[in-house]
Amino acid sequence: MAKGAREKIKLVSTANTGHFYTTDKNKRNMPGKMEIKKYDPVVRQHVLYKEAKIK
């Protein structure tokens, strides 16, 4: 059975609130670290989220 191309990642808020989202990404199409603006409910505004490994 072949290994899948998708891996689970955690998107951590850069506002240092401790809030995070979990998602998955295709590591063949996106080899770099993912950065995306998403809503942080702790500070109630859109902030930058950066990729981190799920432990």
From Swiss-Prot:
GO terms for molecular function: structural constituent of ribosome. GO terms for cellular component: cytosolic large ribosomal subunit. Keywords: Ribonucleoprotein, Ribosomal protein. The keyword Chloroplast does not apply. GO terms for biological process: translation. The keyword Amino-acid biosynthesis does not apply. PANTHER family: 54S RIBOSOMAL PROTEIN L39, MITOCHONDRIAL, LARGE RIBOSOMAL SUBUNIT PROTEIN BL33M. Belongs to the bacterial ribosomal protein bL33 family. This is Large ribosomal subunit protein bL33. It comes from Aliivibrio fischeri (strain ATCC 700601 / ES114) (Vibrio fischeri).
